Amino acid sequence: PDNINRSSDGNYWLAMTGMRTPAYDLAMRMPGFRTRMVKRVPPDEWLYSNINNGSVIKFTAEGEVLASYWDKSAENHPAITSMREHRGYLYLGGLMNNRIGRIPLPDADPTWDSSDSYWGPKA
């Protein structure tokens, strides 16, 4: 997980990031290979997924997942490291990305737009 932000409805957004390898992708398409791997290779040498599919999860304070958005192709928004809800949209960014993503959130508060919305008014 990387970066947690508040949503306009009082819940939270979480960015997930990592990198995926061609060897892992190949192993996931070969069940026999995976079976042999877990029988013959020590666990600390197994292939693990480090998925670079951009993903953002919305969840409650209790940890219940309410929504998830991700880029299955890992082409548009790989390795998302940040997100911020602003005026009815969820903006996505990543350290290695050359673009900013924007997802419309139909149920979001369209007035949620400043530090006062996010943190509350200054005392």
Residue ranges and their predicted role:
Residues 1-123:
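Sequence-structural signature of mature extracellular/luminal beta-sheet repeat domains
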